[in-house]
Amino acid sequence: MFLNNQNFENRSSRSSSNINSSETIVDLKNPQIIYKIRLESVNNDNLLNLDLDKSESHTGGEQHLELSSPPKLDKKSKNFNKIHDLVDSKKNKNRQRKKIKTKIHIDDDDDNFRDSNSNVSQTAGDLAISLMRPPKPKVEVVKKLTSNKKSIRQKKVAVTPSQNSASIQSNSPPESISITNPLTIQELSKLICVQETDIIKYLFLKRISVTMNQTIDASIISSVADNFGIAVESNVKENNNGLSSNLDNSNAFYETGNYIKRPPIVTVMGHVDHGKTTLLDYIRKSNNANKEIGGITQAIAAYEVEYIKKDNKQKIVFLDTPGHEAFTSMRSRGANLTDVAIIIIAADDGVKPQTIEAINHIQKANVPFVIAISKIDKAGSNTDIIEQDLLKYNVMSEKLGGQVPIIPISSLTGQNVDKLLETITLLAELEDLKADPTQPAQGIIIEAHLDKSHGPVATLLIQNGTLNISDNLVIGSAYAKIRVIINNAKEKINLAIPSSVVEIWGLSSVPATGEIALAVKSDKEAKLKAIENTSKDSSIIQKQRALNSRITLDTLKNTNSKDISKQISLIIKTDNQGSTEAILDSLSQFPQSKVQLNVVSIMPGEITATDVELASTTNSTLIGFNTNFAPGTKQASAKSNILIENYQIIYALIEDIKRRMEDLLDPEYSEVPVGEAEVSTVFSLANRKIAGCRVINNKLLKNSWIKVIREEKVIYQGKIESLKRVREDVEEIQAGNECGIFISEFQLWQSGDKIHSFDLIPKQKSLF
């Protein structure tokens, strides 16, 4: 029989070993009826020919076939019939969906017949080549690579925690780092080239829960860096308000040789209420001490005084510094500004903490100083004791062989005040103080505030050069084109020479107290330098960041590594930058292990309706210090039900904030021993366990707290509910007597248990 139909040709091509061009006659062992045969004329090349390879071996009587790899057929040709019925069409579609690509079955049931050689392929022990399909076309491989690239990109996006992670991964961590301030997790990540997530994970394993924007102190920074093999060098320097650095970097000046003698700048320092302002009142013939709120100075005040010596007038600039402990930065600033210092010590009070602090500031700044012992007109004053106390702080009077003049004075009667002024001028002459008025102006901001009529206003002490109207100044991140200059006598002037204290208008914003003011050539240059300085956080911003969200290792140890849930949020408006700095310095002294302090905003200016809205949104306490209310503020406060606290004395403000923090504390108790007893026997009464005890020390009280101790371990702590002697209820049992104790929630009494009775006394709430 000649096989010349298309079905058999394709079927044979899949199961035979070779295809030859010659015709072959095959005997069919299992003939089957073939349906739907369509005859067509074909060439000899299309005929199926089976030709056994003569070279194949016949080992063991088994016949091995060598199959040639069939050409890949189009999916459409899986149905070999040109004429389809509905059933065959559906079957082909189902097969295409299954996509069976792993193995070719010779006896596939999708054909309409069985090949006679199918038995051979089934019984053959081995086939010469694999029956697996050939590899897929390259197009499909390209698709796979493309999809892999997409998945890689997706993984990168998922893993990257921030935009700088790629740079962090590419940069190797440094061997050591230097820190000067507390850092946020983000800043630390950039500094040590370690991803934020790795830092947070490490701290979490240490039971320290932080966020990326949270500030951590040097102790935690050192712990993190040590974990990643990085050494830490702490260079936390005392804040001198940027004086030295700004002066060193001032390139607006040049040497001209036109130096002239300038008046000395004298700072008056000392403990609160020791008579600093009273002394200056006497010198200036004024009465500022009685005008000050609370009787204390709360800002640096600058005065120009003319001292007449032997018919010669000599100008002296005095700086009056606050003596309250909150104004440490102001005293430090005064010590750095001054040419000569006066340290006031009250004869009836002696050396106090702020006295010692002032001495340290002056000695560190290497400034000559005079000790003035005030209030010698009071009874009981003893200057010799004060001189002896000063020896502890390396201050030796001229009388004892030292170099520090000590002058007893009375600011009320004026006793020895002239001698004090003469001593100051002599020390100033020894310093040979000079300045060049031909240079551009250079000075320092003593105070600054926002005036509702004139805008930002600053008090400037000119140290060198001359300041003119229309000069361009750069003051930190602020700049100015001077519109008005007002001298110490409240007069408008056109220029100010060295050692002058003036008020200036025309600033772009309120500058920070202690900032250096430099005159530059043009308005454009001033703006550019101000923009450069904007990127550097001011001292006030640094202090606020360090105060807010502050976390230390000590804090976490004291709170058993629990998150601090108690928090007070504050919005504070002050009268000037100096007050702002003083308040932040005071608040930073409060420990935050128990209550977190969060300063949402602190700045000079009036209290406005916007502040009220912010307080309502952030659930903050709105506080004012020596400031006023803008129009509409009180109405907004009443509408939002926001209480505004306004203070005029700084220590009242600080104490009130401290009290608010303490009110949030949970009560703490101390245990006061009352008595001791021992369980002699245990008996039951109406299904209740009663401990028969003998009081061995002091007494037992009904409703008192007790600890039940067994084998030196506390097994129960609670209150005595019932205390009986025989059958009688009693309030207390004295030592040497027996009693019965019942506690409903404790029934596990045993003979020999020790009972320690105590009272819980509430402790005074404290943040420390």
Curated annotation (Swiss-Prot):
The answer to keyword Protein biosynthesis applying to this record is: yes
Binding residues for GTP: 270-277, 320-324, 374-377
Q: Which GO terms describe its cellular component?
A: chloroplast
Which InterPro entries is this protein grouped with? EF-G-like_DII (IPR053905), IF2_II (IPR044145), IF2_N (IPR006847), P-loop_NTPase (IPR027417), Small_GTP-bd (IPR005225), T_Tr_GTP-bd_dom (IPR000795), TF_IF2_bacterial-like (IPR000178), TIF_IF2 (IPR015760)
Molecular function GO terms recorded: GTP binding; GTPase activity; translation initiation factor activity
Where it mainly occurs, coarsely classed, is plastid
Do you know which Pfam families this protein is assigned to?
EF-G_D2, GTP_EFTU, IF-2, IF2_N
Q: Which SUPFAM superfamilies match?
A: Initiation factor IF2/eIF5b, domain 3, P-loop containing nucleoside triphosphate hydrolases, Translation proteins
Q: Which domain of life is it from?
A: Eukaryota
- The question of whether rRNA-binding is a record keyword is answered with no
Ranges of Basic and acidic residues compositional bias? 54-65
Chain positions covered by the region annotation Disordered? 1-20, 54-77, 155-176
Residues of the tr-type G domain: 261-434
Q: Which UniProt keywords apply?
A: Chloroplast, GTP-binding, Initiation factor, Nucleotide-binding, Plastid, Protein biosynthesis
Q: Where in the cell is it found?
A: Plastid, Chloroplast
Task: Show the stretches that span the lipid bilayer.
Answer: none
**What Gene3D superfamilies does UniProt report for this protein, alphabetically?**
P-loop containing nucleotide triphosphate hydrolases, Translation factors, Translation initiation factor IF- 2, domain 3
UniProt lists compositionally biased (Polar residues) regions at 160-176
Cited function? One of the essential components for the initiation of protein synthesis. Protects formylmethionyl-tRNA from spontaneous hydrolysis and promotes its binding to the 30S ribosomal subunits. Also involved in the hydrolysis of GTP during the formation of the 70S ribosomal complex.
Q: Which HAMAP family match?
A: IF_2_B
* Family statement drawn from the similarity comment of this UniProt entry: Belongs to the TRAFAC class translation factor GTPase superfamily. Classic translation factor GTPase family. IF-2 subfamily.
**Alphabetized PANTHER family for the sequence:** TR-TYPE G DOMAIN-CONTAINING PROTEIN, TRANSLATION INITIATION FACTOR IF-2-RELATED
Q: What is this protein called?
A: Translation initiation factor IF-2, chloroplastic
Q: Which organism is it from?
A: Pyropia yezoensis (Susabi-nori)
